[in-house]
C-alpha cells in the first residue's frame, strides 16, 4: 500500500477527510485533515496517535509527524471541495493562461458535472464567468474571510 493510500485509509477510518499530505526532504510528514464541524486540537492528537502506530507497524520511515487543519486558506483539490465551498471567495491559478491570465479571484459556483464556475470581475469591472475543470487547475485556495469587528 502506498503512503498516501495508507494515510487516507487511516484518516477516513477515524471520520476525517485527508485534505493534503506533504513529505519534506528532512523526513517531516505534514498531514492536513478536516471535517464539516472543523478540526480541534484533540482531533489532531487523535489522528497523530493513530498514524504513529500505523506508520510504525508498516515500517514507514519519518523523523517528525505533524497533523493540523488546512487553515483558513484551505486548498481545494477534489470536486467535493468545490461543491462544499460553493458561494465562497476563492483564488484559482490555471495551468495555462485563459484570455491572457492564469490567476482568478472570485465567487465559486457549484460544479455542474465536471465543470466548475467562478464569477469574477472582468476587465471593465463587469461580472464575468470562468468555467474550468479540475484538470485545468494548478492550484485553488479559499480566500480567508475574517471579521474582527464581531468579537467583543
Curated annotation (Swiss-Prot):
It holds the Pfam family DUF150_C. Keywords: Cytoplasm, Ribosome biogenesis. The keyword Cytoplasm applies. InterPro entries: Ribosome_maturation_RimP, RimP_C, RimP_C_sf, RimP_N, RimP_N_sf. It comes from the Bacteria. GO terms for biological process: ribosomal small subunit assembly; translation. One of its GO terms (cellular component) is cytosol. Transmembrane segments: none annotated. It is found in: Cytoplasm. NCBIfam families: PRK00092.2-1. PANTHER family: RIBOSOME MATURATION FACTOR RIMP. Belongs to the RimP family. Required for maturation of 30S ribosomal subunits. This is Ribosome maturation factor RimP. It comes from Burkholderia ambifaria (strain MC40-6). The gene is rimP.
